[in-house]
Regions:
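Hydrophobic alpha-helical transmembrane segments
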Residues: 25-30, 57-61, 72-77, 103, ...
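Membrane-embedded alpha-helical hairpins and interfacial helices in multi-pass inner-membrane proteins
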Residues: 48, 120, 124-202
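Alpha-helical membrane segments and adjacent membrane-interface helices in multi-pass membrane proteins
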Residues: 41-116
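Helix-loop junctions at the membrane-solvent interface of multi-pass transporters
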Residues: 37, 41, 65, 91-92, ...
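Hydrophobic transmembrane alpha-helices
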Residues: 2-72
């Protein structure tokens, strides 16, 4: 049986890439565009400047699928796009004022979280639900480790926890679980493709 799927570190490295550099750039750009799309799934909350968005799910998926370096690069590109004025942040936000505003820490946390999740994915944590949800849960915590202290500079520590951490925990668990289902499912599909190819080659 082919062992290609076990040798690949991440899903993005699983498929043949004759033009590796171009493929890397394409994947990094695609990750930033996914983030931009998920950022528009934003629900503002009356008690906090931090909206509920699909961004954190995007961070987990991009980091897990692209790996540490490409995942972090994709998040950096996303931040650059927003800082340059492209409406890629939550609810079409853009510009340095958003990037360095009250929820800017969460945005910078995306880079670190994608790197951490990617690093764990490169070590096989994205292959099963149990290990994947641990990796993605850690990724969520990394985002809050950046976001909450940053928000505290604007509103104080207690209010930062009330407005920028506790209300988002249930959603964080759901997103980590969703990513924990999607990435192992993608690997299962890859393994099935390998089996089909092996059968065809016999």
């Amino acid at each position: 049986m082919s062992n290609a799927s076990t040798l690949a570190l991440t899903l993005s490295e699983r498929f043949p890439r004759p033009w590796a550099r171009l493929a890397d750039l394409t994947l990094v750009l695609a990750g930033s565009l996914l983030m931009a799309a998920l950022a528009q799934l934003a629900v503002p909350l009356p008690f906090t400047p931090v909206p509920i968005t699909g961004q954190t799910l995007g961070v987990l998926l991009v980091g897990g699928a692209l790996g540490s370096k490409r995942g972090a690069a994709s998040m950096l590109l996303y931040l650059v796009e927003g800082a340059c004025g492209l409406p890629v942040f939550a609810a079409g936000g853009a510009g340095p004022l958003v990037l360095f505003g009250p929820h800017g820490g969460y945005l910078f946390g995306f880079v670190a979280a994608a790197y951490c999740v990617g690093l764990l994915a490169e070590r096989g944590f994205d292959r099963s639900f149990r290990s994947a949800i641990l990796a993605f849960g850690l990724g969520e915590l990394v985002i809050y480790a950046f976001g909450v202290p940053w928000l505290a500079v604007f509103v104080g520590t207690r209010q930062a926890l009330v407005a920028g951490f506790w209300p988002f925990l249930p959603g964080a668990v759901v997103k980590a679980a969703a990513a924990g289902v999607l990435l192992p499912a993608a690997w299962s599909a890859v393994r099935r493709l390998d089996l089909d190819k092996d059968e065809d080659n016999r």
